[in-house]
Design a protein with these regions (language model features):
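A short, flexible low-complexity segment enriched in Lys/Arg and Gly/Pro that occurs
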Residues: 67-73, 253-260
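Short hydrophobic/charged patches on amphipathic alpha-helices used for structural packing
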Residues: 261-265
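Short amphipathic alpha-helices and their capping/turn segments at secondary-structure boundaries
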Residues: 1-2, 217
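Alpha/beta catalytic cores of group-transfer enzymes, especially the acyltransferase/condensing modules
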Residues: 13-15, 42, 103-255
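FabD-like malonyl-/acyl-CoA
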Residues: 2-146, 274-307
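NAD(P)-dependent dehydrogenase/reductase Rossmann-like domain
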Residues: 178-179, 218, 271, 294-295, ...
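Non-catalytic positions within long, well-ordered alpha-helices that form the structural scaffold/packing
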Residues: 187, 268-271
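Short glycine-rich catalytic loops that host catalytic nucleophiles or stabilize transition states
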Residues: 197-200, 268, 301
């Protein structure tokens, strides 16, 4: 039975893991060809990295971001001919670039070049070990914002909400000292958990403003077209059709929070009933289930799920 009222979402940094999607690479020539193209452009053998690289190797921002774009688009190329046109698309953080490729706003080659430069600038913006991120579970956004605002009065302790992921999960980003202080204060204020996360870059906070300003030059050189599929953007969780405004919002996205909760709310208002996560892992499916029990989720991390989707769409 064909899918109806569905959308597709693309995961970002944090969903990668060693050995991911290997069954796709070994069984689907079209899928493998996307990795081959990226490997040539990057000068790095991504397939070997997936098969032999460690978790730490895959967690380096300058590797992770192009790797996630490649993985997401390899899957999109595989399923786009199987399914009808989705109601809309969205991507989490760097996953937004995959959504824009799928919507024909950017070519894959331009998106890959942009993501490589984006990751380089973000990595260079804060010296290694001086920034951090943490997940706060079970504390309301208003309380987290108050805590972060208070701590950030000292510029050495800059910290703010970076990913508004669900009703009870918010990721904060900032200086290492700011993160450590925020973790303690969030716990004292009733957070169920406050966990530092292994990320080399404190994304989506004002520490990235300088990187965003430099990145604007690269975005100005890329060709942007009107989306052929509606895309909900991270910065404001709204649909955007104007190529120049999309370009501007990609700059803003680097130092502003990802509004994932509001993105899924927007999809429910558009009568989306099924969401396919087009990338490795099941992180976004997990978040979506916590936001709405009414939405069915399908992850493509499992090769069997892809085969089931493929067979169902041919019926």
């Amino acid at each position: 039975m064909a899918l109806n009222n569905f959308s597709i979402v693309f995961p970002g940094q944090g969903s990668q893991y060693p050995g991911m999607l290997v069954q796709y690479i070994e069984n689907l020539p079209l899928f493998k060809s996307t990795f081959d193209k990226s490997s040539d452009l990057l000068g790095t053998d991504l397939i070997r990295l997936l098969k032999q690289g460690s978790k730490e190797d895959l967690s380096k921002t300058e590797i992770t971001q192009p790797l996630m774009l490649t993985s997401n688009i390899a899957l999109w190329n595989q399923i786009s001919s199987l399914v009808e046109k989705p109601i809309c698309l969205a991507g989490h953080s760097v996953g937004e670039y995959a959504a824009l490729v799928a919507a024909d706003v950017l070519s894959f080659e331009d998106a890959l070049s942009l993501v490589i430069e984006r990751s380089r600038l973000m990595q260079a913006a804060v010296p290694m070990g001086e920034g951090g991120i943490a997940a706060i579970i079970g504390l309301e956004e208003i309380n987290i914002n108050k805590i972060c605002s208070k701590i950030s009065q000292n510029p050495d302790y800059l910290v703010s909400a970076a990913n508004l992921n669900s009703y009870n999960q918010i990721v904060i980003s900032g200086t290492k000292e700011g993160i450590n202080k925020a973790i303690q204060e969030c716990k004292s204020s009733g957070a169920k958990r406050a966990i530092p996360l292994p990320m080399s870059v404190p994304a989506h906070c004002m520490l990235m403003k300088g990187a965003a300003d430099k990145f604007s030059d690269s975005l100005d050189k890329a060709k942007f077209s009107e989306p052929k599929i509606p895309v909900i953007l991270n910065v404001d969780s709204l649909l955007e059709t104007n190529p120049e405004r999309i370009r501007t919002k990609l700059i803003e996205q680097i130092y502003n929070p990802v509004r994932w909760l509001d993105t899924i709310k927007s999809m429910t208002e558009m009568k989306v009933t099924t969401i396919i996560e087009c990338g490795p892992s099941k992180v976004l499916c997990g978040l979506i289930k916590r936001i709405s029990s009414e939405i069915k989720t399908i992850d493509l991390d499992s090769f069997d799920n892809y085969l089931n989707l493929s067979n169902a769409e041919r019926v």
